[in-house]
C-alpha cells in the first residue's frame, strides 16, 4: 500500500456531505461536541498543558478539538483529507477569532516532511476510518518530538460495542447517522497496543469513554468495552 492509498474515498465522501453541519450543536456531530471537553481535559492533564506547544490534530474534520486546543494557547495544525470539512474549520476559526493552521494532506505525506516537529499529536476517532491504521500510528510516532505525547481514540470491537455504537447509536437512538461506522474496522485495545509496540511510542495509560442515554451525557472511566482513549509518549 502506498502512502497515497491510505484513504477510503467513501469515508471522505461521507464526512464531506455532512461538513456544513459540523458546528451544529444539535446536529450529526453533537456527540463530538459533547465529548470534546472530556477529550481536551484528558490531553491537557496528561500532556501537562498545551500552552505554547506545537500540536497536530490528525483527522481534524471541522476543527472541534483543534480549535479548543488553540484556545488553550497551543500552536495548532489541523490535518484532514476532506476539503469541505477543512473549509468549514477555517471559516469557524475566522469567525471565532482563533488562530490555527489547517492542511489538506495524508498524515503519511505530512510525516515525510515534518518528522519530529510536534510536542503533542492527537488522533481522535480517526483510526477506524482508514484502511491501514498502523500506517497512521507510525506516522504519528514520526511526527512527535522525543518525550512528546501522542493520543489515540477509537472504538473496541466486540458484541457490546456493536450493540452500543451501531445498533443503539445509529439505528435506535439516531445519535449519529446510520452508516457512520463499520464495526469490522473497530480496533481491540490489544490490537492497538500491538501496533503501538511496532513504533517508538510507549503506552502510558488507557481510559474508557462512557455514554449514559438516560441523561444524554458522557464521562471517562475504566471500562474500555466501547470507546477508549490511549495516551502514549515517545522514548
Swiss-Prot record:
Any GO MF annotation of the entry: polyprenyldihydroxybenzoate methyltransferase activity
Enzyme class: transferase
Biological processes, Gene Ontology terms: methylation
Catalytic activity reported: a 3-demethylubiquinol + S-adenosyl-L-methionine = a ubiquinol + S-adenosyl-L-homocysteine + H(+); a 3-(all-trans-polyprenyl)benzene-1,2-diol + S-adenosyl-L-methionine = a 2-methoxy-6-(all-trans-polyprenyl)phenol + S-adenosyl-L-homocysteine + H(+)
Pathway: Cofactor biosynthesis; ubiquinone biosynthesis
Binding residues for S-adenosyl-L-methionine: 39, 59, 80, 124
CDD domains to which the protein is assigned, alphabetical: AdoMet_MTases (cd02440)
Enzyme Commission designation: 2.1.1.222, 2.1.1.64
Pfam families: Methyltransf_23
Family matches, as PANTHER family: METHYLTRANSFERASE, UBIQUINONE BIOSYNTHESIS O-METHYLTRANSFERASE, MITOCHONDRIAL
Protein name in UniProt: Ubiquinone biosynthesis O-methyltransferase
Taxonomic lineage from the root: Bacteria, Pseudomonadati, Pseudomonadota, Gammaproteobacteria, Vibrionales
This protein's encoding gene: ubiG
